[in-house]
Each structure stands twice: as structure tokens, then as C-alpha cells.
Amino acid sequence: GSEMCIRDSSYTVRDKETDVELEVDNQYIMSPKDLKTIHFMNKMLDAGVRVFKIEGRARGPEYVRTVVECYKEAIRSYLDGTFTDEKIAAWDERLKTVFNRGFWDGYYLGQRLGEWTKNYGSAATERKIYVGKGIRYFSNIGVAEFLVEAAELNVGDKILITGPTTGAVFMTLDEVRVNLEPVQTVKKGEHFSMKADKIRPSDKLYNCLLYT
């Protein structure tokens, strides 16, 4: 939602979710949509751009990881001559999982008008549901122990582990054990173990679900 204050020929739009104010003057506005330039990175590199800044303030670690990975792959593809429509489509699908408000191209391709998002809230294709926290890591066998504090998990679920040092780790839950016995589902209040790269106590565990 938004609130509008009329000021002569210009006005200010305030986003209720973020409290961000956008100045609108004649036909020039700033867009609350997420700026995406990956599909014409080749043109930007051809033009001599050599530094790209990824905005990630107030975003989760999964956003930072996914965006940086995609743009890094795009630059490498440009350099080795494999920057293709197929790769762009694949990057777009990955970016859609973490972007919140839809995409626009900014003014890089000559548009005068900005774009307002049509979606209230998030337009990401995936949402993360908090499951629980890390308890300990057994480095000698590569096993992590977690406590389920909220939503249950099932074998086959896509999960996300985040933490200040761990960063963002995506994986599929292939096997899970409770009291050393394999189970299909872990529920609130249960401690469970699974194979994982190193995690830290208090790392957060999420279930990644597709929006329906």
C-alpha cells in the first residue's frame, strides 16, 4: 500500500512496508521494482562498464548469494563468449526466487517512465518458512544437529541454512534421522540430524516453498 501527499505539480509516495519515500516530479519517478540488468550485461560491458554494485541492504543472505552468483556467472559467460539467451533465462528463474517486487530495466535502455510494482508485498517465486536452529556440528562425520522450533520438514524438501559465518547454504533434505533412526518427517520439538557442510550453533534453518 502507499500514502500520497500532493505538492503542487509533484508529490511524494510513501511505501507502508518499508517507509521509503519516492519523489514523483512530472514524468520522472524512482521505481520500487527491483532493478535487473543481467539480460543486457553484455551491452553494459561492451560500453566499458567495469564495476557493478549489488544492492543488498536489508536483504537476507540467500538474496545476496543468489544475486552475486548469477551476475558473476554472467560476467564470466561474457568473457568466454557463452552469454546466451538460454543462460539468461536460467539466471532469470534463479533471481525470481529471491526478488520481492518484480523486475524493471531502469533507464539503461532508454525508458523515460519508471514502473510501479503491481504486486503488494513479495513477488518472489519462493518463500522461506522458519523451521528451527542449529545445535551442534559433528565435524568427524559431517553431521549437523538441529532443533525444530516451528514448521515440520519432510525428506525431499528444499532447505536453506543461514548464519553470520555460514552465509546461505541451499540443499535438498535427502536423509534425516531422529535418535539415529531414519524418518520421513521431523516435527516441532524434535532434535534431528542430517549430513551437511559445517554449520554453527544458532544457525537458522528454513524450508523453501514455492508460492502457489
Locations of regions flagged by a protein language model:
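Active-site loops and adjacent core secondary-structure elements that bind or stabilize anionic groups
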Residues: M4-C5, Y11-E17, L22-V24
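Active-site mouth loops of central-metabolism enzymes
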Residues: V24-K36
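Anionic-ligand-binding alpha/beta catalytic cores of soluble enzymes and soluble regulatory domains
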Residues: R57-I129
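Long hydrophobic segments that form regular secondary structure
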Residues: K36-G60
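Beta-strand/loop-dominated core regions that host nucleotide or nucleotide-derived cofactor-binding catalytic loops
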Residues: E126-L210
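Conserved small/polar residues in nucleotide/adenosyl-binding loops
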Residues: G1-S9, Y211-T212
